Amino acid sequence: MACPWQFLFKIKSQKVDLATELDINNNVGKFYQPPSSPVTQDDPKRHSPGKHGNESPQPLTGTVKTSPESLSKLDAPPSACPRHVRIKNWGSGVTFQDTLHQKAKGDLSCKSKSCLASIMNPKSLTIGPRDKPTPPDELLPQAIEFVNQYYGSFKEAKIEEHLARVEAVTKEIETTGTYQLTGDELIFATKQAWRNAPRCIGRIQWSNLQVFDARSCSTAQEMFEHICRHVRYATNNGNIRSAITVFPQRSDGKHDFRVWNAQLIRYAGYQMPDGSIRGDPANVEFTQLCIDLGWKPKYGRFDVLPLVLQADGRDPELFEIPPDLVLEVPMEHPRYEWFRELELKWYALPAVANMLLEVGGLEFPGCPFNGWYMGTEVGVRDFCDAQRYNILEEVGRRMGLETHKVASLWKDRAVVEINVAVLHSFQKQNVTIMDHHSAAESFMKYMQNEYRSRGGCPADWIWLVPPISGSITPVFHQEMLNYVLSPFYYYQVEPWKTHVWQDERRRPQRREIRFKVLVKAVFFASVLMHKAMASRVRATILFATETGRSETLAQDLGALFSCAFNPKVLCMDQYQLSHLEEEQLLLVVTSTFGNGDSPGNGEKLKKSLLMLKELTNTFRYAVFGLGSSMYPQFCAFAHDIDQKLSQLGASQLAPTGEGDELSGQEEAFRSWAVQTFKAACETFDVSGKHHIEIPKLYTSNVTWDPQHYRLVQDSEPLDLNKALSSMHAKHVFTMRLKSQQNLQSPKSSRTTLLVELSCEGSQAPSYLPGEHLGVFPCNQPALVQGILERVVDGPAPHQPVRLETLCENGSYWVKDKRLPPCSLSQALTYFLDITTPPTQLLLRKLAQLATEEAEKQRLETLCQPSDYNKWKFTNSPTFLEVLEEFPSLRVSASFLLSQLPILKPRYYSISSSRDLTPTEIHLTVAVLTYRTRDGQGPLHHGVCSTWLSSLKPQDPVPCFVRSASGFQLPEDRSRPCILIGPGTGIAPFRSFWQQRLHEAEHKGLQGGRMTLVFGCRRPEEDHLYWEEMLEMARKGVLHEVHTAYSRLPDQPKVYVQDILRQRLAGEVLRVLHEEQGHLYVCGDVRMARDVARTLKQLMATALSLNEEQVEDYFFQLKNQKRYHEDIFGAVFPYEVKKDGAAGLPSNPRAPGAHRS
């Protein structure tokens, strides 16, 4: 028989630690005194340790032969201070000294030159399968160590019982090769393993674990019954109780009892045919395994997976969890009613099922256990992780946050509200949950207790710091020491990857590949792919963007060209112009900014490219431009690049494409991309070019299929602000009309309004002078009613409905996210654009709805570019006029809700200072009316301007503030400014002079010279804010006011650029060149172009600059943010007609900065 005493009485040398400072452990150099309070046998804490609770009794030095009396020395303290590691809390300054780590079992994964602390499942925390029993000589010392630890946990030594148990375990191992834990030992081991778990933040409850001993079960059915008992006990109608069920221990590794599920309760994740995932993406692989084993999928978002149980090493069996055992919590928010519409829920019981309990050399591969949720586990990880349900962006949109701007911190705001909803929902249902702040504080208390009681606390900082709130939780500032003690809960390899199937017919069809084989296959495939890509023609795709739209399309283009080429997508500011000499194929996707300029990240390339004189490499190229046809310089930057590359000798692969944001931009891009791709395949003679399968994005069906849409009645009342916030990712608030005043005289045939809006609260939303107010208008009731009268088979106009679409495989319906549930009347009034002429794509779909063949053919003809442009420019029809022109169209409500474009907000420069009028926002609005067909057509109205003009006092106005960081007053108020703004271009300058007036009168701050250049037709007709300008000049806010009149009788027309040339040449030089001042231009884009041309002429003359130098001079002004432009497109049809040759807009109702 092996001698147990060699493991019980190990000779140890003690090293003296000369540390002199005391710490919170309060145990350096002190003797151990066990607590005097008795603990009864029934107390759940009867195995709670004293100071050395996790340590085995101190061994005696000397010979093996000893008397039982000498065992009393097992509890004696060491003769000197033990070695320790000092850790510090950087928030409180408190230090701990860890000695418990000397009892650590084995090494962690860290190496001298690398740290593996952030690895999810490191090898050091994972135990794999076995194919034979643990050898007795390995098992015995671990068993004795555990027995020592167990008996060392009692308040009073039980020496005789201790020795007897050591003898019994030793004999049992020698006889059978293993041993069995007693019931009390099992309880102690499971609790101690929880206590030792470094990644658990809730260990303060470790001694309250309920242990269910299921070591006697032998079948999967018995396992299922034990698990049902566990779930029922732990759930406890929502008052969650921590529990563990322990199945038989591992013998030879071939008869394991295992739960194949990662958790007892988890939701299925289905890989859909279109590549999307329905349900929980984390469980896709396991869900497919269940399906392969015979489970019938339900294809819902929250389907509880069956239990997959393996008994005695046999093939696993499936068991459906009785629904009454699964307590689920529906999610709602205490303030946001729409949160219920997300239709979220979560199960109440977090029960980990796939870990292994190691104790005394024994392994229990089946030991499901549970605690209760910390809110962030659900609210952050389950709902917000990109690889999980990923609801963050949808919530951000519904909250009205700016989800397109990371710097707006929309993610942080949204994730907090999601966690508020989770906590609120659990608490409302009386289901146990703990917020992460309370959890962190409880862990700090637990950690302090552990250091006092046993001199250490293994802790993994990466796992314990909650996924939100970071440094405002105390655990963030706490240094931690991570190590593995025994007993311990280890990770395991997924059982389906290692299971030896007894019935090959039940083996899942999709066999797993061994990791080494997989690595080799991946490496080999990557080598082949690298060689294949290297042999392909290289294609460089450049983009320049202000909003990110061009980048998105460039990435889509890269996906298309990767089917046959070796593409690389780059931003223009990352591209080295010298690489043009090496290019084979260059593709450019870019927007145009301002007055025909490049976006900011394209300026560098533009300047270098325009200066390039020659190119020896003759490559192929193609360009696609994005923009708005409301601007005369539509896609100008794209055409500039095209022209320059052609001049340098490059060969155009395909005509330059144009994407108009007002008219089917995406359709235009897809068409151009496919045309360009095919041309490239032909030009470079790509192998198999006629059989290449291109991405689905470029092959989507452009026809209307009514079977894919349906309307469902909905009772949810419409909250307009919340709906608009969600749809447009803006923070929409309500202002109310205070007053409106016509700024033009009664002699004028036009109307320009000063619209004063008052806030509903005590103070208007925050904004700065020069920023914009986005306004959500309503469509005219006459247009809405006219369309409603022509809808076929539609619901009642005021019946709330929601649009649902059929998934691609046709197995279920999903709620369309484009529009909120609302009535058809509300959709046409608030959400859908019914005044912009239909795109060619929409006309093609309408052609399917025509019952008269002649009308159908006419609609199909209008889909051709030449016919379409003529029809659109001449008629500029609203959707109602299209229905009137083609009366045989049978348009359904689902067609309207799914196919009409979204009504966009209209932007107006704010004409007031928040400091001067803190409860108001003022706008300057030109009211637009016109007739099409050379004045012979129907009367059209600007959508937003006409709506604003029709409002009555206290009527609501949904709106939001849009920042304009490039058009604000100088930070140094002493800098001189020149303000140029004819017509409604005066709007932001009114906010400028009001701000300066407030600073002068209330703060005593004087600003630099401010010169205003205004333009209008006649002084007695349309000189906007004339009296206010005079008042500002009298008070010294405006130092000079110059007005250009363009319609004085018997006088030549004078424009603002003429004033600059004739009166202010010297002032321009002083402000821009000598005094480092600022110049602001606001108004029509053609005016801004003429002003820029005049200013360049003035500066070139004054500074003797050539054309290239003056361009660079103004480029530098813009870079220094001293030349500011806030411009909008021409919106009046007679202006369009007059300047049609210059490429002015064909859509007269496109939103401008101040007119719509």
UniProtKB/Swiss-Prot annotation:
Domain (Flavodoxin-like) ranges: 539-677
Annotated FAD-binding FR-type domain residues: 730-970
Domain of life: Eukaryota
Region (Calmodulin-binding): 515-535
Signal peptide: none
Reactions performed catalytically: 2 L-arginine + 3 NADPH + 4 O2 + H(+) = 2 L-citrulline + 2 nitric oxide + 3 NADP(+) + 4 H2O
GO molecular function: calmodulin binding; flavin adenine dinucleotide binding; FMN binding; heme binding; metal ion binding; NADP binding; nitric-oxide synthase activity
Record-level GO cellular component terms: cytosol; nucleus; plasma membrane
Phosphoprotein found in the keyword field: yes
UniProt-annotated stretches for the region Disordered: 27-84
UniProt: FMN binding residues: 545-547, 549-550, 591-592, 628, 635, 661, 665
Post-translational modification: Polyubiquitinated; mediated by SPSB1, SPSB2 and SPSB4, leading to proteasomal degradation.
InterPro entries: CysJ-like_FAD-binding, FAD-bd_FR_type, Flavdoxin-like, Flavodoxin/NO_synth, Flavoprot_Pyr_Nucl_cyt_Rdtase, Flavoprotein-like_sf, FNR_nucleotide-bd, NADPH_Cyt_P450_Rdtase_alpha
Cofactor: heme b; FAD; FMN; (6R)-L-erythro-5,6,7,8-tetrahydrobiopterin
E.C. number: 1.14.13.39
Ligand binding (L-arginine): 263, 372-373, 377
Annotated positions binding NADP(+): 750, 929, 984, 1017, 1046-1047, 1053, 1055, 1057, 1090
Keywords on record: Calcium, Calmodulin-binding, Cytoplasm, FAD, Flavoprotein, FMN, Heme, Iron, Metal-binding, NADP, Oxidoreductase, Phosphoprotein, Ubl conjugation, Zinc
UniProt: (6R)-L-erythro-5,6,7,8-tetrahydrobiopterin binding residues: 118, 381, 462-463, 476
Span of the annotated motif DINNN-motif: 23-27
PANTHER family for this protein: NITRIC OXIDE SYNTHASE, NITRIC OXIDE SYNTHASE OXYGENASE
Quaternary structure and interacting proteins, as annotated: Homodimer. Interacts with NHERF1. Interacts with GAPDH; induced by oxidatively-modified low-densitity lipoprotein (LDL(ox)). Interacts with S100A8 and S100A9 to form the iNOS-S100A8/9 transnitrosylase complex. Interacts with SPSB1, SPSB2 and SPSB4. Interacts with ELOC and CUL5 in the presence of SPSB1 or SPSB2 or SPSB4. Forms a complex with ASL, ASS1 and HSP90AA1; the complex regulates cell-autonomous L-arginine synthesis and citrulline recycling while channeling extracellular L-arginine to nitric oxide synthesis pathway.
Functional note: Produces nitric oxide (NO) which is a messenger molecule with diverse functions throughout the body. In macrophages, NO mediates tumoricidal and bactericidal actions. Also has nitrosylase activity and mediates cysteine S-nitrosylation of cytoplasmic target proteins such PTGS2/COX2. As component of the iNOS-S100A8/9 transnitrosylase complex involved in the selective inflammatory stimulus-dependent S-nitrosylation of GAPDH implicated in regulation of the GAIT complex activity and probably multiple targets including ANXA5, EZR, MSN and VIM.
Protein name per the record: Nitric oxide synthase, inducible
Gene name of this polypeptide: NOS2
